[in-house]
Curated annotation (Swiss-Prot):
One of its GO terms (biological process) is receptor-mediated endocytosis. This is Cargo-transport protein YPP1. One of its GO terms (cellular component) is actin cortical patch. The lineage of its organism: Eukaryota, Fungi, Dikarya, Ascomycota, Saccharomycotina. Signal peptide: none annotated.
Length: 817
């Protein structure tokens, strides 16, 4: 007879399984908030999170932190036997114990107590869950991660590179031999850490060391991780080899019957290809066109494969990027989008069939980011892919994901003060990269949309990205340290955040952010200095702004002499020089500024010599060419001439020079300059024609709108007002205030002009960032509202005053290169 005293563990209720799984799923992502239904499990998961907070992406916790965490760990160990809630759940007990002893092993390692560390790690390794029937798939994933984490620290504890590598090569594939889901971030993290410690040159070496075949997709994946960690491009020689392996897998695969699933080997190989094609896309490396046939065959041999559709999305975009045939380029891009649509459709189906649970939420977010970065409104496909709707769905999904996993999220109001409200979020590396990329993608798509700027959505996107990108240089020896890719990415996010604050006219906060976050650690970040100077220029005393500009110009000149000035910094150099001229004009007068003008042309010739064609353009658009930049300089000169007496001909000549720089491209700035010159010359009809031409192509063009408004509401100053203006601005060399004005046929004609101007200005403040923050626009709106006897004129006048007081010397866009 069976022993009646043997206690049979009860079946775990499904509700308990669900909440435990959700807690483990959140922890694998790097989450910090858990409600598993077991206080002991929540406590040990929280302990593990706090330990990882000081371990992941850093050199480990400081000794005081180690001491605190070690004491808590030891208290948990003592209380294990008294945790009655675990009595009926042996699988949870073993999980808690395993996590705890891993934590103890890590803490002892970082305290330098290597023998004690090894004892705890070996104890954790011996803990086996014999109640396999009660283990869920999530528990098995979590157990696999714990074993790999344990393996990594057992390798480190040996303190011998050869022993460590032998341990890794001997054991890793015994525990994990398939590429894990991207959402299993902690397993990803430790696989990456192990790979970073391995020494090998070729894929064949790696396979031999692991005693497996080189065709193994997991081996190829490990090799790809190593390539991600290295700036070298040796992997490019393996493209044909990968294709050969893929074709071998295809030969063995067949389309599944109704009772079968897709071929595992083919799907696994496609998972590897996702990383490979993403890597080649990032590095702008062309792949073999024969991959096209491979991916088509993969589709033919699978049924609604999530993995194949995502692989195809990456591949077709790569083929599009590298095609010289415009028709093929568009066709491949369309194929990439269609495969994204399939990827989403298959994921949604999985979600519905699995109790509203995503197959791999991080992979899902990653696919959205990729397709939105590589497409635009013009790529929309009727009834299939609507770009704007896809962006909205992505934003909603991202916020829902954060809510579901209780991840820290900075709100719109909090995002206005990063220095006060920021927190450091530490997630596994692959999770951080995907989420940072997601928030950055939303910012890049919506950064020109006024409603998202005013609602503080843009600052929120950037803050949530910055919370994930916390890798910075130490303050010590700042200049000697070489900046890595992560530091550069964070610095760029910080600049965009400061720039967005300045756009919103939160000038003081922008100044604090620039000085505290960026310039204290990156003294040679020129565009941040330029933005700081523009922010400082709103102050009545322009001396601080002027000093900043002069100092940075000296530093940039030194970099130029040392031949270390990058192309975008050369553009910055020119615009910084123009900002200097604007400040000189404001402080000392226009004539003084005109004396400095020749220096700009000399600088341009030095920065962009004809003998260096690589400096001709920053990108494919005409507005990114050095010719366009030269036109901007001539237009700047023309505007300056217009502000002086008897220099109409010089202004006209400067505009002509700008037009002659490039005859193939029509620069609307030349029309705008001609319009203002025509106002000065009392030629309102010519001026109107020029402004109307610009508004036809760009209905929200600020300069054209203001010029049009000037024609309808000309400013005429009396003698006393003119003398007073000259006294306060030190502009004795400026023209009289009389301006040209339009002649109306009758009152109906005049009313129609007012109505048109009202319509244009009201549309502009709803759509254009520059127009919304322009004091001139609000001034002319107040005049119109006053004529219409609309009380809104008071509010418009207040906004005019507010934005005039916060108006920089030049547009902020001139520092953003």
């Amino acid at each position: 007879m069976p022993n009646s005293n043997v206690r049979i563990p009860p079946t775990v209720p499904s509700k308990i399984i669900d909440v435990v799984d959700q807690a483990l799923r959140a922890r694998l992502l790097g989450g910090s908030t858990f409600n598993s239904g077991f206080d002991s499990l929540d406590s040990v998961l929280n302990l593990q999170f706090r330990l990882h907070y000081h371990v992941i992406g850093s050199n480990g916790p400081a000794k005081p932190v180690c001491d605190v965490l070690l004491k808590e760990s030891q208290n948990l160990e003592k209380n294990m036997s008294m945790m009655e809630e675990l009595n009926d759940y042996p699988e949870i007990t073993k999980l808690v114990e395993k996590i705890l002893f891993n934590c103890l092993g890590i803490l002892f390692f970082h305290r330098g107590q290597f023998q004690e560390s090894q004892r705890c790690l070996l104890h954790s390794l011996k803990i086996h869950n014999n109640t396999a029937s009660q283990k869920t798939a999530l528990m098995e994933q979590y157990d696999r991660y714990l074993i790999v984490e344990n393996l990594y620290y057992r390798g480190l504890v040996s303190q011998d590179i050869n022993i460590m590598q032998n341990v890794f090569y001997k054991e890793l594939l015994a525990h994990v031999d398939t590429i894990p889901p991207e959402s299993n971030g902690l397993l990803f993290e430790y696989i990456s850490l192990i790979v970073a410690k391995l020494r090998f040159n070729q894929i064949q070496d790696l396979a031999e060391n692991f005693k497996t075949t080189v065709e193994n997709p997991f081996i190829l994946f490990l090799y790809m991780i190593k390539k991600f960690q290295s700036p070298l491009k040796k992997h490019i020689d393996n493209d044909d080899l990968y294709l050969k392996f893929g074709q071998n897998v295809l030969l063995k695969a067949k389309f599944p019957t109704a009772s079968e699933t897709n071929d595992e080997a083919l799907e696994h190989f496609n998972v590897f290809l996702q990383y490979y094609f993403k890597f080649t896309h990032i590095k702008k490396i062309k792949v073999n066109p024969s991959w096209y046939n491979f991916i088509i065959s993969s589709m033919e041999k699978t049924f609604q494969s999530i993995e194949v559709s995502k692989t195809a999305m990456f591949l077709f975009q790569n083929l599009s990027d590298n095609s010289n045939d415009e028709i093929k380029k568009k066709t491949f891009k369309r194929e990439s989008i269609l495969n994204f649509v399939n990827f989403v459709k298959y994921n949604d189906k999985y979600y519905q069939l699995h109790d509203n649970s995503h197959r791999d939420i991080i992979s899902f977010i990653d696919a959205y980011s990729f397709i939105l970065q590589n497409s635009s409104k013009t790529d929309s496909i009727e009834n299939v892919f609507d770009y704007d709707n896809t962006v909205s769905t992505f934003a909603t999904s991202l916020n829902s994901f954060y809510k579901e996993y209780n991840l820290p999220l900075m709100s719109q109001s909090e995002s206005l003060d990063w220095l006060e409200n920021s927190t450091r979020c530490v997630y596994p590396g692959n999770i951080s990269k995907v989420l940072t990329n997601a928030w950055s993608t939303l910012y890049e798509i919506r950064k020109y949309q006024l409603d998202f700027l005013v609602s503080n959505n843009l600052t929120s996107y950037l803050c949530n990205a910055m919370m994930l990108s916390t890798k910075e240089k130490d303050n010590a020896d700042v200049e000697e340290q070489e900046e890595g890719e992560e530091e550069k990415a964070l610095r760029e996010l910080q600049f965009k955040y400061s720039y967005t604050l300045a756009q919103q006219r939160h000038i003081e906060t922008a100044i604090k952010t620039l000085e505290s976050l960026i310039l204290s650690k990156n003294p040679n970040y020129y565009k941040a200095w330029h933005l700081l100077a523009l922010c400082r220029s709103v102050q009545e005393d322009k001396e601080m702004s002027y000093k900043i500009v002069c100092s940075v110009l000296e530093a940039m000149n030194e970099s130029l002499q040392n031949n270390t000035l990058l192309l975008n910094d050369r553009w910055q150099f020119i615009h910084l020089k123009l900002t200097q001229l604007a400040l000189i004009e404001e402080i000392f007068g226009t004539l003084e500024a005109l004396e400095t003008l020749p220096e700009v042309f000399e600088l341009y010739a030095t920065l962009f010599p004809d003998s260096q064609p690589e400096l001709n353009s920053m990108g494919p658009k005409y507005s990114q060419t050095k010719e366009y930049l030269l036109q901007m300089v001539w237009i700047f000169a023309a505007n300056m001439y217009m502000r002086t007496k008897d220099n109409d001909e010089d202004a006209k000549a400067a505009i002509k020079e700008a037009s002659n720089v490039e005859s193939k491209f029509k620069n609307l700035n030349c029309n705008i300059a001609n319009g203002y010159l025509s106002i000065i010359k009392d030629e309102p009809g010519v001026a109107l024609k020029e402004f109307e031409t610009v508004l036809y192509y760009d209905e929200n063009n600020l300069d054209a709108l203001v010029g049009f408004a000037e024609l309808i509401f000309p400013e005429e100053l009396g003698v006393e007002e003119t003398n007073l203006e000259r006294y306060y601005t030190l502009s004795l060399d400026k023209k009289p205030g009389k301006r040209a004005k339009l002649t109306f046929v009758n009152d109906t004609d005049r009313s129609a002009a007012y109505a048109r101007l009202k319509f244009l200005l009201e549309c502009a403040i709803l759509e254009s960032i520059e127009a919304y923050y322009s004091p001139e626009v609000w001034w002319y709106l107040s005049l119109i509202y006053e004529k219409y006897q609309d009380d809104e004129y008071k509010n418009s006048l207040l906004k005019c005053i507010k934005y005039q007081e916060l108006n920089p010397i030049r547009s902020l866009r001139y520092c953003n290169y």
